[in-house]
Amino acid sequence: MPLPDFRLIRLLPLASLVLTACTITSPKGPGKSPDSPQWRQHQQDVRNLNQYQTRGAFAYISDQQKVYARFFWQQTGQDRYRLLLTNPLGSTELELNAQPGNVQLVDNKGQRYTADDAEEMIGKLTGMPIPLNSLRQWILGLPGDATDYKLDDQYRLSEITYSQNGKNWKVVYGGYDTKTQPAMPANMELTEGGQRIKLKMDNWIVK
């Protein structure tokens, strides 16, 4: 099936509130060594989570387009997750359901698409080259395949630098939600060239 010229809605008056809410403030204090036992324990605690979900604000900004949305991310098992994007008025713009070997996406017109790579599918359908395969780890505060990263003074990720498919991504964490155990990212910003992706997590539910 030919891929449509599908785009999420552009900037709406309500969307400016989302952008303000996503402002990043860098963690303070000296960083800790990536070889520290506290960091290894934190990574293990996060990896031990079987199920989790989070919701919040999403912004994608580039020279070509500006997209603002609410998001809901739910992980129900190994490589099984659901991503929902809604516009500031509450209407669904994109729903993605992924499991091993199968990805289904429904757009804002109700059209259903199937593929085996969620990252490639979202890039083609939305025009937003989101590094989804890596973001699945980064949103948890894990480095994924990245080896160039820094920790904050609480032995949590503060910054990641990662090269993927000729693109150099930088991820900056602006804080953590300590109401959950283990502590989970509260907001983060990804940059690559002239594009930025901002995420602000309102809350986490972990199991």
UniProtKB/Swiss-Prot annotation:
Topology relative to the membrane: Lipid-anchor
Residues with lipid group (N-palmitoyl cysteine): C22
Pfam families, per database record: LolB
Gene Ontology cellular component list: cell outer membrane
Record keywords, A-Z: Cell outer membrane, Chaperone, Lipoprotein, Membrane, Palmitate, Protein transport, Signal, Transport
Signal peptide span: 1-21
Cellular compartments annotated: Cell outer membrane
Transmembrane parts of this sequence: none
PROSITE patterns the record matches: PROKAR_LIPOPROTEIN
Disulfide bond positions: none
Lipid moiety-binding region (S-diacylglycerol cysteine): C22
Keyword Cell membrane: no
Gene Ontology BP annotations: lipoprotein localization to outer membrane; protein transport
Family: Belongs to the LolB family.
Function: Plays a critical role in the incorporation of lipoproteins in the outer membrane after they are released by the LolA protein.
Subunit composition and interactions: Monomer.
Protein's name according to its UniProt entry: Outer-membrane lipoprotein LolB
Organism per entry: Escherichia fergusonii (strain ATCC 35469 / DSM 13698 / CCUG 18766 / IAM 14443 / JCM 21226 / LMG 7866 / NBRC 102419 / NCTC 12128 / CDC 0568-73)
Gene field: lolB
